[in-house]
Amino acid sequence: HCSYFTMAKCEQWKSHCSYCSQLRRYPACFAMSSVSKNFERKRRAFTGVKNMTLITPSKWLADLTRQSFLKEYPVEVHYNTIDTSIFKPTPSDFRERYGLQDKIIVLGVANVWEDRKGLFDFYKLAEMLDDRYVIVLVGLSEKQIKELPKNIKGIQRTNSPQELAAIYTAADIFVNPTYEDNYPTVNLEAQACGTKVITYDTGGCKETIYSLRSTIVAVGCIQNVAEFVLKQGKK
């Protein structure tokens, strides 16, 4: 029933789901006995369609689809796109408003911040950076903002794409330490605004990197992220 199974290292979806270690994760299932029934119901529903072409937003997901009970169906990859009339270099007074004029801004953006999005990796990164740097995280809850260490600046979610583009532009580096993802468009948005990106090599993340100034590192290698970030301060 899982949306993601990377962190759980589960491959039951290839054959038959039964015991689920992520029973309460979205979308929550409240009875272990329902896991097997749900899997079989979905198998019957999808494989009962005679003429179907599957569309995935990444090659990574397309490859997984070919390992599932959907493997008999053709799969096409159609990447999600962003609006480059909005996500482009956008000058603003963001640095002045937050008193960050002389700081090297390391940015992170998520709709919901949790362990799989790498929130606590930013905590580790903050300990590795000197006073020239400030980490700015967009999308945090009020509670999360109150719990931040002093060298991380928290901002609640913005519903304005234009404001988000201005924040991307103000940043020096965009860091996406995601542990589970499909095709994160935040990487596309940051690069479109002229900001270099470093992201973990999970899911379809590598497919989002197109700028020669951006890079990927192995999942969980926050030390490599820190080295990349610190190099920017030497320029």
Where does each model-flagged region fall?
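Aromatic "clamp/platform" in nucleotide-sugar-dependent glycosyltransferases that forms part
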Residues: Y179
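Acidic anion/phosphate-binding donor-loop and adjacent secondary structure
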Residues: R66, T81-R97, K146
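Membrane-proximal helix-turn-helix segments that form the acceptor-binding/catalytic region
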Residues: C17-L54, F69
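Short alpha-helical donor nucleotide-sugar binding micro-motif in glycosyltransferases
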Residues: A166-A171
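Short hydrophobic beta-strand element within catalytic cores of glycosyltransferases
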Residues: K196-T199
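Conserved donor-binding/catalytic core segment of Leloir-type glycosyltransferases
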Residues: G99-K117, Y123-E127
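Nucleotide-activated donor-binding/catalytic signature segment of Leloir-type glycosyltransferases, i.e.
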Residues: G139-Q162
